[in-house]
Amino acid sequence: MRSHGRWGPCFLLFLLLLPPPLFRAGSLRYHGPGWRMFQRLALGSRRANHHHGPGWRQQLRQGQAGHRCQGSFDLYFILDKSGSVNNNWIDLYMWVEETVARFQSSDIRMCFITYSTDGQTVLPLTSDKNRIKNGLDQLRKIVPDGHTFMQAGFRKAIQQIETFNSGNKVPSMIIAMTDGELVAHAFQDTLREAQKARKLGANVYTVDVADYKLDQITAIADSPEHVFAVENGFKAMRDTVDALTSKVCLDVTSVEPPTVCVGEPYHVVVHGNGFQNLKKQDEVICRFIFNETTIVDEKPTSIDNNSMNCPGPKLEKPGEEYFIEVSLNNGKTFFKSNVSVTSSTCGIFSNWLYFLLPLLLLPLLLCCLWRLCRKKTVKEPPPVQKPEKEPEQEKPPPPPPPSPPPPLPPPPPPPPPVNTCPTVIVCCCACQGVCGIRGIEGNLDTFCDLSHPSCCQVPWMWCQRRDQGRYLSLALAQSQYAQAPCCPRIGFPHSQESPSLPETQPGVLFPSTDSVQPKELPSTWPAVPPHCSGTLQNPLCPSLPRSPTSKAPNTQD
C-alpha cells in the first residue's frame, strides 16, 4: 500500500503534463463506427411512443426488432379496395398500420390512396402525426367494392407529387398493392401512369396477393427487386414489412471517419439504406454541405446496397464541419441526413501556449522523481505472528495399581550332609566346656581357646583325608614353637603345608594313646573312620602364636 501511495501524486502530475488537445472530443481521429446511428435510433424509439391508434401498440410489440427509417422522403400507399378484397380488408389495414409505424422520422411525409373503379385520396401528403393517425382511422372504416383499376390510384399519386414536390425536392416512394389480375386496358394504363411517376423522381414498389399475375406486377415495378409477392393470403402480408421497409427507406445512418485531419486527402464511407433504388450507378452523387453557399459534390468510387465510398473534400482549417446528402437520380432529389464530418489538427499543435503548462510543471516532476530516487526504502518489519495456543495436554490416566509381587520361590532344600571324615575333638580329661567340635574353620587358636588348660597334656592327632591325601598344616607352625597352656604335642608333616584349614578338609583330632586311655564315645557321635589314626609327631600348639583376638583360657572352668 505504501508504494501505491508514493506514486499516486506523480501519476496525477503526469496527467497534468499531457497536452490539453488530447483531452478534447475532436482530438482523436476516429470514433466508434455507427455512433450517430445508435443515437438516432434511440431518438426514434422515443418518438415511437407518441403514436396513437388501436394498432400502434400491437405493431410496436411485434416489430420492435424491425428497421426504423429516419430518412427524408415522401411515401405513397396505393391500396386496392375492389370487391375481390372483400372481408380481407382488416388484414390489409393491419399491414398498412405496421408499415407506417416503421417510418419514424418527422421528415417523412405520407399519403393514403385507395382505388377500385375510381381513385380516392384518403390522406393527402403530410408529416403531421395527428393527421396520419386520423387517416389510419378513416382507412380502417372502408368497405371494399368495385373493379380493379390500378391506374386510377397512380393518377391520384401523381397529383400529390406535382402539388407538394415540385422541383424534385425530395425522393418519392410509391407502394402499389393489388389482389388480382388486371384487365388488359387497365394494365396498359397503369404502365403509362407508373412511368410518369418515375419521371417525377418516384420509385415504384409493388405488393401482390392472391390471384395476381407476376409478369404484370414486375412490369409495373422499377425492377424485379422491387416486387413483393405474397403466396399465403392477406394474413401473410405482414411478413413482408421488414424487407419492404429496409428497401423503401432512404437514409444515411453513419459515416466513417467522423473526424478527419486538416490538409490530408481522405475518403469517407457513407452507410445507409435504399441504395438499391438507384437506376444507374453514374447517377449517384455524394453532396457535402458546409453552409448555404459552400457545397461540394463528388461521385462515389464504389456502391453496394448499404454503403458507398466517396472522396472527401479537402479541409484547410481545424473545426470545419459539413453534412452529407445522397442523390440516386443524378441530383434531381437528395435525401437528407444529420450525419456530419469534422476536421481536426490530429495532434499537431499550432499554438505555442499548449507547451507553456508542461514546461512550467516539468521541474516539479523532476524534483519529485529525484526525491523518490533518494528516499531510502524502509523495510517494514515482518508481521508478528501470534503464538498459536498449544493444545492442552491431556493428563495421563493414573497408573494402574501395581500388581502384587509374585510369591517368592521356596528356599532350596539344604544340601544333604556329606559323609566325609569329620573333625572330631575328643576331650579326654574332665574339661568343663565343649567336649567336641565339628567343622572347625580358620586356625587352631579357636580350638585352644575352647579347651581347658588341664587338658593340654593330651596329644592330638590329625587325620588325613581319604580322598585328597593331604595333612593340615600351618605356615607359622614350622617357624616357631610356643608352649600353649592346653596344647599337647601336635605336629604336621613338613611336606604337607596349607595356609589355612579348608572347610572341605575336616579331620579328627583325638588324644594319643600313650598317656590317656580312650573312652567310649557317645552313641550319637559319628563313627571314626578306620583310616583316621596315628600320632602326630610334631607339636602344634607350642609353635602357634597367640592371635590378638583369641581369649585367654578360663582356668576356673
From Swiss-Prot:
Basic and acidic residues composition bias: residue spans: 386-395
Record topology, Cytoplasmic segments: 367-557
Keyword Metal-binding carried by entry: yes
Transmembrane feature ranges: 346-366
Record topological domains on the Extracellular side: 26-345
Domain VWFA: 74-244
Gene Ontology terms: cellular component: cell surface; plasma membrane
SUPFAM superfamilies: vWA-like
Signal peptide extent: 1-25
Biased composition (Polar residues): 534-557
Protein's cellular compartments: Membrane
Biased composition (Pro residues): 396-411
A Pfam family reported for this protein in Swiss-Prot or TrEMBL: VWA
Gene Ontology molecular functions: metal ion binding; transmembrane signaling receptor activity
Membrane topology listed for this record: Single-pass type I membrane protein
Superkingdom of the organism of origin: Eukaryota
Chain segments carrying region Disordered: 380-411, 497-557
Predominant place of localization: membrane
Keyword DNA repair assigned: no
InterPro entries named among the record's database cross-references: Anthrax_toxin_rcpt_extracel (IPR008400), VWF_A (IPR002035), vWFA_dom_sf (IPR036465)
Family designation: Belongs to the ATR family.
Protein name: Anthrax toxin receptor-like
Source organism per UniProt: Macaca fascicularis (Crab-eating macaque)
Originating gene: ANTXRL
